[in-house]
Curated annotation (Swiss-Prot):
HEAT repeats lie at residues 243-282, 298-335, 438-460, 461-499, 532-572, 613-631, 632-672, 781-818, 869-906, 945-982, 984-1021, 1053-1097, 1113-1152, 1174-1213, 1227-1267, 1277-1314, 1427-1464, 1475-1512, 1533-1575. GO terms for molecular function: cohesin loader activity; zinc ion binding. Expressed in leaves, inflorescence and siliques. Interacts with SCC4 to form the cohesin loading complex. Its main location: nucleus. This is Sister chromatid cohesion protein SCC2. It is found in: Nucleus; Chromosome, Centromere. Residues 175-184 have a biased composition (Basic and acidic residues). The gene is SCC2.
Length: 1846
């Protein structure tokens, strides 16, 4: 009895195995046997005498007896002081010494203090602000295994001890004892004696850490033996205890009852709180000894009745009220204690049913609910303010059931309520001790209510009230402990009352929306993890509910022995049903949540989406933690729902977007876990990978850490595996030197025992004493072994409660579902759950593993779950979403895929992902394409294999239309090259990047230059330590980059792109503007130039090295190096003239001129070498004489004999340079001139090849030797004779010789441009540029002009730089002065203007090359400013429609520059440009058609549908006009002028052969303009209305007059009417029948045309009228049958022609107007209210419908009979009637030049310009068929409402 470590168990020995929980309560029976608290009785004083209990100071020193009378008299005072004492500052846990009062002596003072206050020796928090309090427990050192964060249902097994908690935040201050803290395991939390905090009302997270599972079994056994030797007979002892307890109960009830005859309510006295607490202690004691059911029922009934009266006395009072006093508070506390006592009786198992009176239970629930509301108001001021107006109604019954959205208005409204309350949160330390005590008691009450659910089935009303009250706690802050109890209670209800599960889920989903925004995502639930992660309380509740949805089988609830498992018959499908129940819970919850999301829009939908995202993030945080197996199925069900109609297949775009985001987040987590498992091949994965025997070949390393740690290894005696003790969480003292078995073998043998047990028919005790006689070990799979290790861990760290049982059961349900053969092993699964009950040797089920190892096991097992296996399904659906029509969905899907890729970049190597991502490279949205590239680009550096796979598709994006996409593609390829020095596609990558050096966007050009600067020209860090060879001074890295440059040039078609790179690298002009403004660093410039010089030197060395190879191979190998050197010389020849030896390059390369190779490669090599020498010569002062002579001879020889003229050209130029440098004058040049001149005179044109070569060389010698000839005075050479010779050869019949003569003439004109001003030369040039000239002659003439302009431009540059030339050569003769902008003031401008019209005419030639050369001439002319830019605008606009992409781009570039510099000029010629584009389009179409096919009216009408080439040409033309419109779209005035100029073409069209086709072309062009704002189509409708207002009435009157005039004429016959041939003298006629005679002009395709004063070209009217003689493809002009109707006379036909043309133009405009109104949803009111002078409305959206525009059914041929004329009139009248309302509002303003539409009344709108058939007019467009006589519906049916069609 005096043993300090005694457990105090005075019951039978059968109870000693389990232990009674002593936490937070005082047990009267065992109190004398327990040591006093570690807090000394003198309350922390340094010396005992310093504690002044009395007024006088204590005498003496040392310890005096505490049982003195004067001290005993102060017991009540001591009790009060202890109650109010704050011991939170004491280190109670680590107290080293035990006070002397811990001896076996029993003090009388102790009993007296307990009588005054049973909780005196329990420490409590004085206020919510204090720090957590800890118990002082000795055995903390042996606590090693973390516990399961659980709160489990009470077991109903009558053979097990029960532990009921009174006040959950108190700690009994008793050292050196082991407490059973099972009551304290809240749902899903981890708490331990060392970590559990006292109640903390602050809003911070509550601490839920590890729970010790150490039970000190040896100490318990010893105590049991000691006690058993002195204990009396158990039955006698039980009777004695029950008898004493009954007497105590009678005494308690007697004190509460007032003696009297009547037992009214008023005659019950109030019992002090302390007495009720003493009663509770006694109840807990008798209950823990499992003797409460032995108390007579009448005594218990009387007790419950007495306690019920105590509760009844406090009804209506509140623990927290403004008017509450101390008496009220005591009554409330007494009532709460009475509830505690009542529930302690009723919640006990096997109690008589007479005790469970519904009246008492309802009063308990109602009073508890009321006090919970008061406590919540006290702890959360915002809740108190929000609930105050309805304080008495908020939770009364189900009053709010009629309004399910009570307090569920918009989230913004809820935020305003909280914000406007302006209630400052009360400091937590203000909360009274009474409220704190009440809160603690309410937590105890909720725990007992959960126990009550297991022993008594409550009514539905009670259950619903409990649920509503418990769920309400989640709306309040600072009461996290109460919320934990509520979670446990709700879980118990959910498990036991399945009929209310739907209601619970509904309430939880409602709770999510009711939470104020300030309390959402408040993560106060601490996970049992060392990382201290938290989740929301609501998430924890959801997890608990899913756990509790799997009801435990009765065998696991009631079986006291393992044998009962075999005896109880259970449905083999029970596990499946449990899993289905969990799935149903998940489905119900997510369905409710997602339904709420789809029912809201706007801000509320955004907040609901945020709630869902927070839930998912919480679940992912708890995923794969061993205590939360339900997280996986919760997320799995969510994914299944999101993959179907509620997510990706929903019609709601927002729902699909949210589904994509959530699925991407979840899939990324799955992939991240999979990567973790694949990288860390720890032993659990090795054990669970395959389903083979557990036995494994032993290794030298630790099976767990695989050798990552150091230390002594333990060897398993069975499998010989090795383990570190630290890896298993074992200490050296715990390790047995013999017969040590690893966890794998232990679990394997355990499973074999369970299998054998399930097969046996033994009906004995049900427990196996050993694991012997085990056979067939191969039946156990590796996965089962690892699973059992997890189950053992959960059972070891679990409490006496059954939460760990639920968790283990849930795991078994999941595993049962995933194993196909498990249906035959149901009892085996039950046995695994009850392994400890079956196997008596508890050591066989003890888990040795640390928590880290268990977490790894959980992760490994999770990878095999159906949830993890669903990753591929999620990924496939996300990839499918990349093909959605909506760009925002595609962008979100791409973002989701990118999150997955972030988790594992190797996903990009998946073929499915690669195809999907590459498909997004070609997405229609620029943002999606850029995002797809960004996805790949982020992982290029870290995963080179990804770059190789995607290189080809990324390279294609370098040509993307989006600037940002092109730039991103360039950066990605740059990263591929820099991150991988051995990148196999480096040369191809450089070639792709180099192709963008000519990009239209300057920023892209700068990026390309910067990229190559980083590749080649940037100085690398550090010093050069490695060189190409011993004799070389070239660094090795520079040699490598030079080779890269050589390889790149071999992949490019020409050197120009590389030349641009080198030029800009030398200038460093690609840096940002800020860097340019600060000035380029001269050091950087010098560094680049030095590297370029070294590259040239390296190239020269490579050329010398290749020279040693054979001749054939040498040419091929040396050519790339020479070409790169050529490129450097093109930029700056000074790079090849080193200061140490300027002639080095000339002397080194000169021997190559002796090559006899006659191949194209050899010719290219010679040409480049000659150019390099020619470039360097002007920079050299003097060459050695021998070198000069060799050069002259070699060049002369090649000029005479080389077969490639390009080499000859280079030789002539170089020879002239050598002659200038050598100072020999013109001697050698004149010699060659005489040689070729005499050869031409002697042979003439007999030998075409020799003559052509002579002409070519003669012209070149004159061009390049002009300065030498001029210096010598030309005494020995007759230039006039050469000109005459060239003219003579121009008159030959051989076209090749004529072209060569024209080329030679061009060479002379370049040297002597003044000759072009002579009349005969001018005629030659005009003739060769004429339409009818031969194509080769036109091409050569243009080439001559182009070379002349380039040469003039070059001379201007050389003259400017002549002062800096090393050796200036005097220029003689006639130098052509060219100054940009000088225009006509110099000879160059005069020459260009002389032939400008001819050059512009060639811009529209049907030959592609001729157009391209002409356009280049225009570019040079505009650059030099030689002509007025307005003259070429129409031609450039026409070339925007060129089928050749190069011509399109150059024309567009020139137009862009012109629009920036001369916007007025540009806009004034847009209309003419449109007409020119139409002429050009017709020219191109006709050239490709049949040669003899005439241009027919019907053919041109059906041009879009009949001729594929014509259709593509027209489409190209309209696209070109659209590009032009985009240039001016930003300026309102400019775009309005453009549209007005086109609409005016319909105002007064002049009849010619192609006028109708042109009007249709204009109509389609206007219809397809890329409008971006409503102002644009509105202005076009406005312009159309103006034309209609002026012309429609007159045209109708003229047509009607013609009909009345000829009404007497009759028609007969029904054949096809054909018109007479139009007389040949018919000329162009306008609408006023004036005949126009225009000068004739021949166009390029041979037809006579007419040019008006504006330069517009029209076809001759006679050609057009002739074309109309063909009708329906049959030429039947002169054949007329007798049945044909009377034809129109010539005079009538002339009049009808003008009016019908005007009618056709108006009908086209009406059709365009109708199309605009339907496409852009423009109604009548909007069109009529529009005014072009009104300011634009910013942000006005433009809605556009996809409607095709078709003019194929519009009749545009002329009427040939009066019947046709009547039909045309009727069609025109119908079209006018349908559009009457739109344009008649302008009738009142006809006289105004610029009518301004204004809002008028409907009556005003009825005023019409024509009066006939007004009764048929209506205000809508019903029955719009357009073609009155035909009656057929149009192909486009604008079946919208009338208000939307105007």
């Amino acid at each position: 009895m005096s043993n300090p470590s005694s457990s105090g168990l005075g019951s039978s020995s059968g109870l000693t195995h389990f232990g009674i929980g002593l936490a937070n309560t005082v047990q009267s029976e065992v109190t004398p046997y327990l040591p006093l608290p570690s807090l000394p009785i003198f309350c922390g004083a340094a010396e005992p005498g310093e504690f002044k209990l009395f007024d006088e100071v204590g005498q003496g020193s040392g310890y005096r007896s505490l049982d003195r009378s004067e001290i005993l008299a102060q017991s009540s005072r001591i009790a009060n002081m202890l109650h109010e004492t704050d011991v939170s500052y004491l280190d109670l846990r680590n107290e080293a010494r035990a006070p002397d009062c811990n001896s076996g002596e029993h003090f009388q003072l102790y009993d007296l203090v307990l009588r005054c206050n049973p909780g005196a020796f329990e420490y409590v928090t004085p206020g919510p602000t204090c720090d957590p309090l800890f118990t002082n427990e000795g055995p903390q050192k042996i606590i090693s295994e973390p516990s399961v964060p659980v709160k489990m249902q009470r077991q109903t097994d009558t053979h097990l001890a029960r532990s009921i908690e009174p006040e959950p935040v108190k700690r009994v201050l008793r050292p050196n004892h082991v407490e059973d803290h099972s009551w304290q395991h809240e749902t899903l939390t981890n708490q331990s004696p060392k970590d559990v905090t006292a109640y903390d009302s602050r809003p911070e997270t509550i601490t839920m850490n590890e729970l010790s599972a150490s039970k000190k079994p040896k100490g318990k056994k010893k105590r049991k033996d000691d006690l058993s030797s002195v204990q009396p007979d158990p039955s006698v002892l039980q009777e004695s205890i029950v008898q004493n307890f009954c007497e105590m109960l009678e005494d308690f009830c007697g004190r509460a009852e007032v003696p009297g005859d009547d037992r009214d309510e008023a005659e019950w006295s109030s019992v002090p709180v302390d007495e009720v607490r003493v009663l509770i202690n006694e109840l807990m004691t008798i209950r823990s000894k499992m003797l409460l059911h032995m108390v007579p029922v009448d005594i218990l009934s009387r007790l419950l009745r007495t306690l019920d009266h105590q509760i009844h006395r406090a009804e209506g009072l509140s623990i927290y009220s403004e008017h509450s006093d101390s008496d009220s508070v005591l009554l409330v506390l007494g009532a709460l204690e009475s509830i505690h006592a009542s529930l302690a009786v009723m919640a006990n198992s096997d109690m008589p049913k007479q005790l469970y009176k519904e009246e008492i239970i309802e009063r308990i629930l109602e009073f508890s609910r009321h006090q919970m509301m008061a406590v919540m108001s006290a702890y959360d001021p915002s809740y108190r303010t929000g609930s105050k107006p309805a304080e008495n109604l908020a939770f009364e019954g189900d009053d709010d059931d009629d309004n399910p959205d009570h307090d569920m208005g918009s989230a913004s409204k809820r935020r305003r309520i909280v914000k406007n309350s302006k209630v400052k949160k009360a400091s937590v330390n203000r909360i009274s001790g009474a409220v704190n005590t009440a809160l603690q008691k309410l937590c105890t009450i909720l725990g007992l209510l959960k126990d009550l659910l297991l022993v008594e089935r409550l009514s539905d009303s009670c259950i619903l009230q409990l649920l509503k009250t418990s769920i309400t706690t989640f709306l309040v802050e600072n009461i996290q402990i109460l919320q934990l109890k509520a979670i446990s209670l709700i879980g118990g209800i959910y498990n036991s009352y399945s009929q209310h599960r739907t209601y619970v889920i509904d309430e939880i989903s409602q709770l999510l929306w009711k939470l104020p925004s300030s309390k959402r995502a408040l993560r106060a639930y601490l996970l049992p993890d060392e990382e201290q992660r938290q989740i929301q309380m609501v998430t924890a509740l959801l997890i608990q509910l899913v756990h509790n949805s799997t009801s435990l089988p009765e065998t696991s609830r009631q079986a006291a022995s393992g044998n009962s498992i075999l005896e109880t018959s259970v449905d083999v499908g029970y596990l499946t049903k449990c899993h289905e129940a969990a799935t149903e819970t998940c489905c119900l919850f997510w369905t409710r949540v997602l339904e709420r999301f789809t029912s809201f829009k706007g801000q509320d939908a955004s907040e609901i989406k945020l709630i869902i995202e927070n839930l998912v993030m919480d679940l992912l945080t708890a995923l794969n933690l061993p205590e939360y197996p339900s997280v996986s199925p919760i997320l799995e069900v969510l994914c299944v729902i999101l993959l179907h109609n509620a997510g990706l297949k929903s019609k709601d775009v927002s729902a699909r977007i949210m589904a994509i985001e959530l699925l991407g987040t979840i899939a990324a987590r799955l992939k991240r876990d999979a990567v973790l498992c694949s990288k860390d091949r720890f032993w659990t994965l090795l054990e669970s990978d395959s389903e083979i025997s557990v036995d494994q070949v032993c290794t030298k390393d630790c099976t767990f850490c695989l050798g990552k740690r150091a230390g002594n290894l333990l060897v398993c005696q069975i499998c010989q595996r090795r383990f570190h003790g630290d890896c298993l969480g074992l200490k050296e003292l715990d390790i047995s030197s013999r017969n040590w078995h690893c966890p794998l073998c232990v679990c394997k043998r355990q499973l074999l025992v369970l299998q054998s047990y399930c097969k046996t028919d033994t009906k004995g005790t049900g427990k196996l004493e050993s694991e012997e006689s085990i056979e067939n070990p191969s039946m156990i799979t590796k996965t089962e072994v690892v699973q059992q290790m997890l189950l053992n861990y959960l059972q070891d760290v679990g409490s006496a409660d059954d939460v760990h049982t639920f968790i283990c059961w849930f795991y078994l349900c999941l595993w049962y579902k995933d194993v196909p053969k498990s249906q035959n092993k149901f009892k085996y699964y039950i046995a695994r759950l009850k392994a400890k009950s079956i196997i008596r040797n508890s050591g066989a089920t003890t888990s040795f593993l640390t928590r880290d190892a268990i977490k790894q096991i959980t992760l490994a097992l999770g990878m095999n779950s159906s949830f993890s296996r669903g990753f591929d399904k999620i990924l496939n659906m996300l990839l499918a979403s990349l093909r959605e029509n909506a760009p925002n969905i595609r962008a979100k899907a791409l973002r989701a895929v990118s999150i997955i890729v972030e988790a594992d970049p190797e996903v990009l190597c998946d073929k499915r992902v690669q195809l999907a991502v590459e498909g997004r490279f070609c997405d229609s949205a620029i943002s999606v394409r850029e995002a797809a590239l960004e996805l790949v680009g982020r992982h290029i550096a870290s995963h080179p294999d990804v770059g190789i796979k995607y290189f080809e598709k990324v390279a294609e994006r370098i040509k993307d239309t989006g600037v940002s996409v092109r730039k991103r593609a360039i950066k990605i390829i740059r990263d591929m090259c820099t991150s991988n020095p051995n990148f196999s596609e480096f040369t191809s990558a450089c070639a792709e990047i180099l192709s963008r050096i000519s990009d239209d966007e300057s920023s892209v050009q700068d990026l390309v230059c910067k990229t190559f600067y980083e590749f080649w020209f940037e100085e690398p860090p550090g010093h050069h330590t490695q060189f190409a060879s011993d004799a070389s001074s070239i660094p090795l890295e520079l040699e490598k980059k030079t080779k890269q440059m050589v390889g790149l040039l071999s992949r490019t078609p020409n050197q120009q792109l590389l030349v641009t790179i080198i030029k800009r690298a030398l200038a460093l002009d690609f840096f940002p503007q800020a860097a340019k403004a600060a000035g380029i660093n001269p050091v950087a410039l010098a560094s680049v130039r030095r590297r370029c010089e070294l590259m040239c030197k390296c190239l020269l060395e490579k050329i010398l090295q290749v020279e040693e190879m054979s001749r054939e191979e040498g040419e091929v190998q040396v050519l790339p190096y020479v070409l790169v050197l050529h490129a450097f010389c093109l930029v700056d020849p000074g790079l090849c003239t080193p200061a140490s030896d300027p002639t080095k390059f000339v002397i080194t390369l000169q021997p190559y001129l002796k090559s006899q190779a006659d191949s194209r490669t050899g010719a290219q090599l010679l040409e480049s070498i000659i150019f390099i020498i020619d470039s360097v010569l002007p920079l050299i002062r003097k060459l050695p004489l021998s070198v000069t002579e060799d050069l002259e001879q070699d060049l002369k020889h090649m000029i005479v004999r080389h077969s490639f003229l390009t080499v000859v050209h280079a030789c002539v130029r170089c020879l002239c340079s050598v002659s200038k440098l050598a100072g020999k004058g013109v001697s050698i040049v004149e010699h060659l001139l005489q040689f070729f001149f005499k050869r031409l005179e002697a042979q003439g044109s007999d030998n075409t090849q020799i003559a052509g070569r002579s002409l070519f060389c003669l012209g070149l010698l004159i061009r390049h030797g002009n300065s030498l000839i001029s210096t010598s005075g030309g005494k020995n050479f007759n230039l006039s004779g050469c000109l005459n010779l060239f003219k003579r050869h121009l008159r030959t019949e051989d076209i090749a010789l004529k072209v060569r003569s024209l080329q030679a003439l061009g060479f002379i004109l370049i040297a002597r441009p003044e000759y072009m001003l002579e009349e005969d030369i001018g005629k030659i040039i005009e003739t060769t540029l004429a339409d009818e000239a031969n194509g080769r002659m036109k091409m050569q003439a243009l080439q001559n002009m182009y070379e002349y302009l380039l040469d003039a431009e070059k001379q201007l540059g050389s003259e400017k730089a002549s002062d800096n030339t090393v050796n200036s050569v005097e220029q003689g003769g006639h130098n052509v002065p060219v100054a940009a902008g000088a225009g006509d003031t110099n000879i160059c401008g005069g020459i260009v203007q002389l032939f400008w019209d001819k050059i512009l005419g060639r811009c529209l030639d049907f030959d592609d090359q001729i157009r391209q050369t002409s356009l280049k001439i225009v570019e040079v002319v505009l650059r030099q400013g030689l002509v007025h830019p307005i003259t070429c605008v129409p031609y450039l606009i026409a070339l925007e429609t060129d089928p050749q992409e190069a011509n399109q781009k150059l024309a567009h570039h020139l137009l862009m520059n012109m629009h920036e510099k001369y916007p007025a000029f540009f806009e004034s010629r847009l209309g003419d440009g449109l007409q020119m584009s139409f002429i050009f389009m017709q020219s191109i179409s006709q050239v490709t058609s049949e040669p003899n096919q005439s241009l027919q009216q019907k053919g041109s009408t059906n041009m879009l549908g009949k001729n594929d080439h014509a259709s593509s040409t027209l489409t190209q033309a309209r696209l070109g006009v659209s590009r032009i419109y985009k240039l001016i779209r930003g300026n309102r005035v400019s775009r309005n002028k453009f549209m007005t100029s086109i609409v005016r073409k319909f105002d007064n069209p002049t009849w010619n052969g192609s006028v109708i086709s042109f009007l249709k072309y204009c109509t389609e062009t206007l219809a397809l303009l890329p409008f971006t704002s409503p102002d644009e189509p509105l202005y076009l409708v406005y312009s159309i209305n103006r034309v209609m207002q002026i012309r429609a009435g007159a045209v109708e009157s003229n047509l009607k007059a013609l009909l009345h005039k000829d009404s007497a004429k009759t028609q007969h016959g029904n054949g096809a009417y054909q018109q007479d041939p139009i007389p040949g003298h018919m000329n162009m006629m306008d609408l006023n029948t004036r005949i126009q005679e225009e000068p004739r002009h021949w166009n390029s395709y041979g037809h006579a045309t007419l040019i008006d004063l504006n330069g517009s070209v029209y076809q001759d009217s006679r050609d057009q009228f002739t074309s109309y003689q063909v009708h329906n493809g049959k030429a039947d002009v002169h054949k007329m049958t007798s049945s044909d109707p009377p034809e129109l006379s010539t005079d009538d036909l002339q009049k009808i022609q003008v009016d019908c043309l005007a009618a056709i133009a108006i009908q086209l405009l009406l059709k365009l107007k109708r199309y605009l109104k339907v496409t852009y949803s423009l109604n009548d009111d909007r069109c009529q209210a529009y005014s072009p002078t009104e300011p634009l409305k910013p942000g006005d959206p433009l809605s556009r419908q996809s409607v095709a525009f078709d003019l194929s059914e519009t009749r545009t041929d002329l009427p040939s009979t009066y019947q046709d004329l009547v039909q045309r009139y009727q069609e025109f009248k119908n079209a006018m009637r349908e559009d009457t309302v739109d344009f008649t509002i302008y009738s009142t303003n006809v006289k105004r030049k610029r009518p301004t539409p204004r809002k008028t009344s409907r009556s005003a709108k009825k005023t019409v310009a024509y009066n006939e058939d007004d009764d048929d007019d209506d205000n809508d467009d019903r029955g719009w068929h357009g073609g009155g006589g035909r009656g057929a519906a149009r192909r486009l049916n604008y079946s919208t409402r009338s208000s939307n069609r105007r």
